[in-house]
Amino acid sequence: MIYEGKAITVKALESGIVELNFDLKGESVNKFNRLTLNELRQAVDAVKADASVKGVIVTSGKDVFIVGADITEFVDNFKLPEAELVAGNLEANRIFSDFEDLGVPTVVAINGIALGGGLEMCLAADYRVISSSARVGLPEVKLGLYPGFGGTVRLPRIIGADNAIEWIASGKENSAEDALKVGVVDAIVAPEKLQAAALDLIQRAISGEFDYKAKRQPKLDKLKLNAIEQMMAFETAKGFVAGQAGPNYPAPVEAIKTIQKAAIFGRDKALEIEAAGFVKMAKTSAAQSLIGLFLNDQELKKKAKGYDEVARDVKQAAVLGAGIMGGGIAYQSAVKGTPILMKDIREEAIQLGLNEASKLLGGRLEKGRLTAAKMAEALNAIRPTLSYGDFGNVDLVVEAVVENPKVKQAVLAEVEANVGENTILASNTSTISISLLAQALKRPENFVGMHFFNPVHMMPLVEVIRGEKSSEEAVATTVAYAKKMGKNPIVVNDCPGFLVNRVLFPYFGGFARLVSAGVDFVRIDKVMEKFGWPMGPAYLMDVVGIDTGHHGRDVMAEGFPDRMKDDRRSAVDALYEANRLGQKNGKGFYVYETDKKGKPKKVNDPAVLDVLKPIVYEQREVSDEDIINWMMIPLCLETVRCLEDGIVETAAEADMGLIYGIGFPPFRGGALRYIDSIGVAEFVALADRYAELGALYQPTAKLREMAANGQSFFGQASSEV
C-alpha cells in the first residue's frame, strides 16, 4: 500500500501502475470535504515520491464517483474574510494542479455520478473513461456559485469555450453519451468493462502509443481563441445567459466573465482569476440563500425517509373525483409506477380525467421523456370506474371532490364502507380541517390530508396533514406514496389552511390593503415580480381563481378572525360579485386571450377599474419598498406563527413549503431565511413601522424575544450532500 487514509487509498496494481481510490469511510457517497482534500494532497505526494510509479488510474469504491464538495462546510467557510477564502481556494487548487503535473500519465475511471468538484477532479487527469450509466456536470450555478476547483479554467481548454459555457451556465447533469460527444471524456464503456478500459488506456499511454504530455498541454496554456472568436463566444453568451437567468441569479453570467478574463492566461494565473470570482459569488446573498435552500432540501428528504420504517407499500391506489385534478393525480401515480383507479359518478368527468392524463403523457412522449410503450403502460395503469366494485384491494384512496366539507364528508363515509379496514383515506383539500372531516368516519386513524398543488404534474410539493386522530402509519404511508409519485412531502399539523395557504392568505391580505389604498394592481404585480416572485399577486389570484380565493379567504377569516377577518369589501369581493373569476372564465384582474400555443395570455383591461372603484377607500402615496413590505411582512409573520404553533416542525420545512408550494423566490431562501437576511431585530423594527395596518403586521412575543437575544432561525448547517 503506497498510501492509506480514511477517504483515499493508493495501491500498486501491476507493472508500475497504481490505483488511487476514493472511498470515504462512514459515508454513502464520496465528496470533497476537508479530510478528502487533505488526503488527496498526501496521496499525490506519496505517488510523486515513489519512483516506481509509471501511471495512475483514479477510481471510486462507491456507486458514485464523487458528488462534489461537502456543501455543509460552505456555511462556515463562506463567513471567512475574502482574502482568507481566496487563499484557501488556491491552496485546494494547488492539490489538483499537483495531480495534473505528475510526471506520469493519469486516467480517471468515472463509474457513477461525478458532479462539481468530482468532475473537476476528472478534468485534472490526462484521460477520462466513463461508464455508460454515469452522469457528469457542474451544477454550482444552482447554488449561486460557479466551479471553484478549476472547472472554469480546464473545461473550456478541453471542449472549447462555447460548449464549456453551456455546461457551466446551465448547471445540468449530462449523460455519458453527451460527455463523449463534446469531448469531456475520451471513451465510454459498459459498467463491467470500466476497470479494464482504464488499465488498457494507461498502458497505452505508458508505452508511448498515446502522448499524454501533448494531451495535457492545452490545459496549461491560454485559451486558443482570437479576438473575433472571443467576442462571438463571450459577448453573445453573456447576453443570452443574462436573459435566461435574470438579474437575481448572477452566477451564470459571472462564470462567463471569469472564463473570458482568464482566456488570455495560462493555467495558474487563470486559477487565480477563478478563485477571486468564486469568492465574490460566495459572498452574495443569492449564494447564501441557495446554499441554505439546498441544505433545507436535504433535511426535508431525510425527514421524509424517516417515515419509511412505519410506512406500508402502496401497491394499488385510487382517486375519487376525476376531472382535471383527478386526472392529474392519476397521471402522476401511473407514470411513477403505481396503478390507480379513477372513480367519479359522471361519465363526462371520467372522460375529462382520462383526457388530462392522456394529454400529459402525450406531452412527455413528444419531448422524448417517455417511450410509446411506457405511455401505453401508464395509460393501462389508470382504470376508470363509476362504482366501488374494485376498491376492496386498494391501499390508499385520494379523495379529490369539490372543496365543500359536507360533500367531502359524505363521499369519505361512502368510500370507507367500500374499502378494507386498513385502507388509508386521504383528502385533497386546501383549507378544510382534517379533524372536522374525520368526524364522518368510523376509522379516523386511517385518515389524513394530502394536499396537491395545481397543476399536479408540475408542482413538487404535497402537504401531508396529520389530523387529531391520524395514526403514524397513515401519515407515514401517505408520505411514502407522495415520494413514490415523485413529490416532496412535508408533514404538517391540522389548522385552517395548513401551512401554505395559511401563509399565502396574509400575503393576499397585504395585497387587498394596497388596492384599497388606491395602489394600481398592475404596479404591485410588477414590483413583486421584480422582487423575485414568478407572478404578481393579482395575476396569481387570477390563476388560482377569484372564486377559490374568495372561499379560501372566508375560511381563513373564520379560523383566524383576530387578524384575517376584514369587514370591508375588498378587490376579491368586487371581482367575485362581478363574475370576474380569473383565467377560468377569461376575466379577473386581467382579461385573457389565447396565444398561438393555446395558452391564456393576460391583457390589461381598463373596465376592471370601474369594478374596483367602490373598494378603494383612500389614496396613499407608497414607494416600491412599501409595496414589498405591505406584502411580505404578513407572509413572513404568519410563517413564524406556523413554526411557533407547531403546524410545521422545522424552519427548513416551512421555507421549503413556500418555495415548492407558492413559488417563493428561491434566491431569497424562504420566508424565515428572508427574515434572517434582514436580521430578526431589524425585521421586528420594520414590522413595527407598519403596525397601523393591523394585526397581520404584529410580531409575536417570541419573535421579539428572539430579536432581543440576537437569535436567528438558521444557525449551523445540519445536513450533507
UniProtKB/Swiss-Prot annotation:
Pfam family example for this protein? 3HCDH
Instruction: Give me the segments passing through the membrane.
Output: none
User: Does the record bear Transmembrane helix in its keywords?
Assistant: no
Keyword Oxidoreductase in record: yes
Q: Which positions does UniProt annotate for substrate binding?
A: 297, 501, 660
Gene3D superfamilies (UniProt xref): 1.10.1040.50, 2-enoyl-CoA Hydratase, Chain A, domain 1, NAD(P)-binding Rossmann-like Domain
Q: What is its EC number?
A: 4.2.1.17, 5.1.2.3, 5.3.3.8, 1.1.1.35
Q: Where is this region: 3-hydroxyacyl-CoA dehydrogenase?
A: 312-721
Q: Where does NAD(+) bind?
A: 325, 344, 401-403, 408, 430, 454
Q: Name a biological process GO annotation.
A: fatty acid beta-oxidation
What chemistry does it catalyse, as a reaction equation?
a (3S)-3-hydroxyacyl-CoA + NAD(+) = a 3-oxoacyl-CoA + NADH + H(+); a (3S)-3-hydroxyacyl-CoA = a (2E)-enoyl-CoA + H2O; a 4-saturated-(3S)-3-hydroxyacyl-CoA = a (3E)-enoyl-CoA + H2O; (3S)-3-hydroxybutanoyl-CoA = (3R)-3-hydroxybutanoyl-CoA
Active-site feature positions: 451 (for 3-hydroxyacyl-coa dehydrogenase activity)
Its subunit composition reads: Heterotetramer of two alpha chains (FadB) and two beta chains (FadA).
Q: Which family does it belong to?
A: In the N-terminal section; belongs to the enoyl-CoA hydratase/isomerase family. In the C-terminal section; belongs to the 3-hydroxyacyl-CoA dehydrogenase family.
Q: By what name is this protein known?
A: Fatty acid oxidation complex subunit alpha
